[in-house]
Swiss-Prot record:
Residues spanning the signal sequence: none
PROSITE patterns assigned: RIBOSOMAL_L33
Pfam family membership, one: Ribosomal_L33
Designated name of the protein: Large ribosomal subunit protein bL33
InterPro entries noted in UniProt: Ribosomal_bL33, Ribosomal_bL33_CS, Ribosomal_bL33_sf, Ribosomal_zn-bd
Keywords assigned: Ribonucleoprotein, Ribosomal protein
GO MF terms held by the record: structural constituent of ribosome
Family of the protein in this entry: Belongs to the bacterial ribosomal protein bL33 family.
Length: 55
């Protein structure tokens, strides 16, 4: 079986405009050492906005 290592961590994605945390995802710390920024739909703003990784 594959080993469970600590390379993947669970992160929250927050909207940069309203600050609401809408999405939860995983990232690999080795491949993405910096904070992730993705364009996602924000239900509060009712449009696609940039979401940034929060701790």
């Amino acid at each position: 079986m594959a080993k469970k290592t600590d390379t993947r961590i669970v992160i929250n994605m927050a909207c940069t405009d309203c600050g609401e945390r809408n999405y939860t995802t995983e990232k690999n710390k080795r491949n993405d050492p910096r904070r992730i920024e993705l364009s996602k739909y924000c239900p509060r703003c009712r449009e696609a906005k940039v979401h940034r990784e929060t701790k």
